[in-house]
């Protein structure tokens, strides 16, 4: 109505009226949350692609499934691809808040007019860096840290 993009990160997963999927521009579950909504186990790359297509059939315009150390999957009616996880310079310390880091960074990327894929790459990088630190909010990197990583 007002040309605003909608992003729903369903964490934690809760029942959603399926007709509301069509209202979403971006739906960003992780693997576990995607399994909750589709009632299917998602383990292989092919399972992920099938899940993505199922969400599109439900009306989601753009599906993003975060895959932790395996990266992220994206699909819409025109394209489908995987983005590898960031090759970390440091050990993973704590994954708390990584999904929040991803979603916040993705929204920032879109707000700064990045193309979808570039916003996903940026978000993936932010989430990866956040796992190398303890905590949730305290683990979020600055723009400078992301650009220098």
Predicted regions span which residues?
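Conserved beta-alpha-beta core of the PfkB/ribokinase-like small-molecule kinase fold
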Residues: 1-50, 70-72
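Conserved phosphate-binding/catalytic region of the ribokinase-like
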Residues: 15-20, 45-149
């Amino acid at each position: 109505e007002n040309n605003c993009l909608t992003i729903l990160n369903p964490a934690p997963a809760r029942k959603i009226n399926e007709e509301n999927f069509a209202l979403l521009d971006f739906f960003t579950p992780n693997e576990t949350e995607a399994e909750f909504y589709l009632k299917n186990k998602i383990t292989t790359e092919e399972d992920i692609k099938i899940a993505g297509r199922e969400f599109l059939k439900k009306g989601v315009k753009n599906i993003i499934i975060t895959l932790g150390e395996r990266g992220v999957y994206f699909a819409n009616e025109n394209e489908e691809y995987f983005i590898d996880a960031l090759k970390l310079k440091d050990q993973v310390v704590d994954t708390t808040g990584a999904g929040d880091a991803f979603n916040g960074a993705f929204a920032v990327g879109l707000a700064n007019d990045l193309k979808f894929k570039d916003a996903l790459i940026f978000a993936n990088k932010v989430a990866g860096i956040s796992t190398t630190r303890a905590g949730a909010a305290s683990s979020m990197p600055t723009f400078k840290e992301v650009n220098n990583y």
